[in-house]
């Protein structure tokens, strides 16, 4: 796979996203596809709340290159299928959501769940199993508090496992706090971040600008 010297880190505000990370929970190594801020415009001012980094298993390179190698960033950023292939691709994703401003777990998860449920209903995949998965998601965040710099990690496996872990900083925990077994719910989390109604256009731009070099030659410039 591409290694640390050939992939650049990303800095979002005071939050550092390393080029390559290894999860002690899975013993797998992931490279940084992209990272960006998420915020809201409140009374005419854009307030940054979180920074999101999407890490990909090395299998992602061959999987995505089949269709997207040679495509320029300008084309990818406007192509929903590119992001959908990241979301649904047969490789693991590790998503880090770190807080710029303090949020309670309930405050943070409420909006994530609203967006996920809206997406699942819009595509007709919200049933009893998904409702149960969303309930498990809500429960996982109830006792969590996120001071600035604290993180949630989402591990998404190709077979539909969504593993959640929480950290006071950017350190990946050795064990996952919760495992949710629902493929639709797992995919919806990343869909809301980089899909059709993405909460982080900045993250989409980062993925589109960085991944072409990886797909073309294994190097991010």
Curated annotation (Swiss-Prot):
The keyword Manganese does not apply. Keywords: Flavonoid biosynthesis, Isomerase. Signal peptide: none annotated. Catalyzes the intramolecular cyclization of bicyclic chalcones into tricyclic (S)-flavanones. Responsible for the isomerization of 4,2',4',6'-tetrahydroxychalcone (also termed chalcone) into naringenin. Belongs to the chalcone isomerase family. It catalyses: a chalcone = a flavanone. One of its GO terms (biological process) is flavonoid biosynthetic process. GO terms for molecular function: chalcone isomerase activity. Pathway: Secondary metabolite biosynthesis; flavonoid biosynthesis. Its EC number is 5.5.1.6. The gene is CHI. The keyword Ribosomal protein does not apply. It holds the Pfam family Chalcone. It comes from the Eukaryota. This is Chalcone--flavanone isomerase.
